[in-house]
Amino acid sequence: MPAGLRFDEAVVCEGAFYANAVLKRIHLERGHEILIYGASGAIGTAMVQLAKSSGAVVTAVVATRQLELAKYLGADHAVDYTSEDFTRVGRRFDFVVDAVGKTTFFHCRKLLKSGGVFAATDLGPWGQNAALAMWSSITSSQRVIIPAPRRINGFVDFLKGRMESGQFRAIIDRKYPLAAIADAYRYVETGQKVGIVVINVAAD
C-alpha cells in the first residue's frame, strides 16, 4: 500500500481498476477526445484522472454541485447535465463512456466522431447497451462495447506511483460502520453519492 495512504483510501482503488480496464479496452491515447458521463461516481472520478494522465482531452458530465470537483480532478471541460443537454455541447469525441449505466448509444451517437466508440460500464436502460455491444461484436464494428474488467500487469504499481505523487486522488463521499450497511446502500441508491461510499468494518 502506498506510503501515507489510509486503508479507506486504498479501498477505493476498485473504481480505478475498472476505469483503467475501460480505457485500455478503448485504446485511449494522447490527444484523443473523451466524454465521460457520470464523472462524479466511483468509476467516473477515477476515469477522469486516468484519462487526463494519458494525455487525453477530457469532458466530464456531472451535476451542478460536482462541476468544481470535475475541474479539480483535471477535466478540461465540465458540463452540467441538470442545466443543459450534454449531447449538444458542440463537439464530437473519439470516445463517449457511460460510467453509471444511465444513458445509451442511441442517445449519445451524435457526439461521436466517425469511427468513434461508445463504451458502457453497465447494461444501460432496458439492457440496450448489452444488445448493441453483442451486435457490434458480431459485425466487428466495435461501435458499442461493455469492457469486462481483467487483470492488467503493472497496474497496481502504476496506481501506487500516481497516488504517492499526488496525481491520483481517492474521492470518498461517506463512511458507514458495518452495522449501518443498509443505510449506506440506501444512500447509494439515491444516485447522489460522489466518488465512493466506504463501509468501515473495523469501526465495529
Predicted stretch roles:
Residues T87-F95:
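A short acidic, Gly/Pro-enriched loop at the edge of an enzyme's catalytic core
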